[in-house]
Amino acid sequence: VNINNEIDKLRVALVKEHTASAPLSSYDKQFKYSYTTAVYKDIVFVSLNTSYGLWASEYITANHYYAYDYKTDSTLSDSQIAGLFGQDMGWVLKQVNSALAALGAEPVTGVDKIELFVNEDLKLVADAKTESVMGGDYSEILVLT
């Protein structure tokens, strides 16, 4: 399963960093890994957050989302996740841009800038990659239901 590969990559990276980090008195990096899970019917949702940075700088953050149907041994697409809530990706795009406007953020240009997941409260959540005023994209996490 794809999630096992991702978790194994993180484990290998942490072991490698740990091996190279002695002595700890001069270690200047921070690693943060966290995850949440939710189960709905036969589907397991996992949200994995990774953050890395030097003590004196900002973090580089990445979010990874998995929706695994263990009954069919398959992963769900964003449109399938939206379908669990009786919605389609057109509705998702409209809701995301409405929420971004309320926050004063730039709208996303298409559904390719959105990743869907289900949080531990079984709410449909969007990770929208919106344009930063400083350049580049950043994630805005939006609860849609």
Per-segment meaning from a language model:
Residues V1-V46, T50, L122, A128-M134, ...:
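Active-site acidic/histidine clusters and adjacent loop/turn architecture
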Residues K29-F31, A62, V108-G110:
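Residues that act as N-cap/strand-start positions at coil-to-secondary-structure junctions
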Residues S34-T36, Y65-A67, K113-E115:
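Short, surface-exposed charged micro-motifs
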Residues A38-Y40, Y59-I60, F117-V118:
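Extracellular/periplasmic catalytic domains that process cell-envelope and extracellular macromolecules
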Residues I81-L144:
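Short aromatic loop motif centered on NTY/YTY
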